[in-house]
Design a protein with these regions (language model features):
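A short, highly charged nucleic-acid-interacting micro-segment common to nuclease
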Residues: 43, 100-117
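Short amphipathic alpha-helical interaction segments
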Residues: 52-73
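Accessory beta->alpha helical hairpin/"wing" motif in late/C-terminal subdomains of nucleic-acid enzymes
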Residues: 72-98
Length: 393
């Protein structure tokens, strides 16, 4: 059995000792805020791989909960799941929770759940509230809602749409789709109708779509592949990319994606970051060039950290129509190395620069991902949440 040490105020320690004494326990395990977040993440996602879970939490924290039989590792899914004990602990914590469901081991369901978990854990690390149980809670920002929580037998308000999550940042309301090689096709009209209907009551400056996957390479692998569609109602994601009127952003579910989401969570992030990067060289873009973020020494400047490649392409075309052969791009290191250099620098379309850590700290305060506090968890009644230790299986 692994041990976990939580520094707690003396009053909490006394209540902890009293609980053990009254219930005849020789010892008991006091749960921390971090423990509860692990359990909640598993309740929302259903299953999470060790890779994603141990990016936000330590291996010991995960193994502690496993030893206490609140979570277990599934060999079939190759991921962590909640146990009935873990669900009971969550139910006693006072949270509003989605319904507990029995795990499914069909391969398509496992794949879908693990992809969703990558989106959720990336958003969680970006400090986004992912613990929503209804769409109306998207009124607060930043927040993320999972439509599958409302998809059950006899009720499916989202129909056959493929949206994985809804994200509300300071300026954007986004429908997130998982897009990787072989992902298939979508009925775009149905997707946009459902997106509008389910978010109409939530004010946002701009609606957008996000294509997410494990990496930029996976997303572009699908977009660059192309495929022949027999059903005229359906479109490939490449066709969606070409025809969608809304802004379309690419998001990897990794550290870069976490930082990208944090940037997108800052109100007016495009102008603010352009001003930070260019300093005294900043000149506002022309009124008829909304795809630009600034002019730098007379050259169009695009802050590309949100990975709206279509906006970059529009900026390149607009600049060339004005007789300017190259624009200037600034983005995060992975974005520059894996996408922008090949597409824009090597083709002579742009000079590409990496956004410095100093500029990011000026915008965000800190570039470190969110971590929950290492403090004891208190219920709404002010008591600590404790459970008797169980024998390790």
């Amino acid at each position: 059995m692994f041990a976990e040490i939580v520094i707690a105020p003396e009053t909490a320690q006394e209540r902890f000792r009293q609980t053990a004494g009254m219930k005849g326990w020789k010892s008991c395990m006091m749960l921390s805020c971090r423990d509860l977040d692990i359990l909640r993440l598993l309740r929302w996602c259903r299953m999470i791989r060790s890779k994603e879970l141990c990016e936000a939490f330590s291996k010991d924290e995960v193994l502690n909960l496993s030893a206490a039989q609140m979570i277990r590792f599934s060999d079939a899914a190759k991921a962590w799941l909640l146990t009935p004990c873990g669900n009971r602990v969550l139910d006693s914590a006072g949270f509003v929770l989605p319904p507990a469901t029995a795990p499914t081991y069909r391969e398509p369901d496992i794949t879908r759940r693990l992809r969703l978990a990558q989106i959720v854990t990336t958003a969680y690390a970006a400090g986004i509230n992912i613990f929503l149980t209804k769409e109306s809670e998207l009124q607060s920002t930043p927040s993320l809602f999972l439509p599958f929580l409302h998809r059950n037998r006899g009720s499916n308000p989202w129909g056959s749409t493929r949206v994985a999550a809804l994200l509300h940042t300071s300026d954007l309301m986004c429908a997130i789709h998982w897009v990787s090689p072989g992902i298939g096709c979508v009925a775009l009209t149905d997707e946009l109708t459902a997106f509008q209907n389910h978010t109409a009551a939530i004010p946002a400056k701009q609606r957008a779509m996000i294509f997410a996957a494990s990496s930029y390479e996976e997303i572009l692998g699908e977009l660059d592949a192309g495929q022949e569609i027999q059903n005229t109602r359906l479109q490939s994601y490449r066709e969606v990319y070409d025809c969608l009127k809304l802004p379309l952003l690419l998001l990897p579910c990794n550290e870069t994606g976490c930082l990208q989401l944090r940037i997108m969570g800052v109100p007016n992030y495009r102008e603010l970051l352009a001003r930070i990067i260019l300093k005294s060289h900043y000149v506002p873009p022309p009124a008829n060039r909304a795809m630009y973020d600034a002019l730098y020494q007379g050259v169009p400047f695009v802050m590309a950290a949100d990975m709206d490649l279509r906006r970059i392409d529009a900026a390149v075309e607009a600049a060339r129509s004005d007789g300017i052969l190259q624009i200037v791009l600034a983005a995060l290191p992975e974005q520059v190395e894996t996408v922008l250099n090949r597409r824009y620098r090597e083709t002579g379309k742009a000079r590409v620069f990496t956004i410095t850590d100093a500029a990011l700290r000026e915008l965000l305060g800190s570039t470190a991902p969110y971590t929950p506090p290492d403090l004891p968890f208190y219920t709404s009644e002010g008591s600590v949440l404790d459970v008797p230790p169980l024998k390790a299986p």
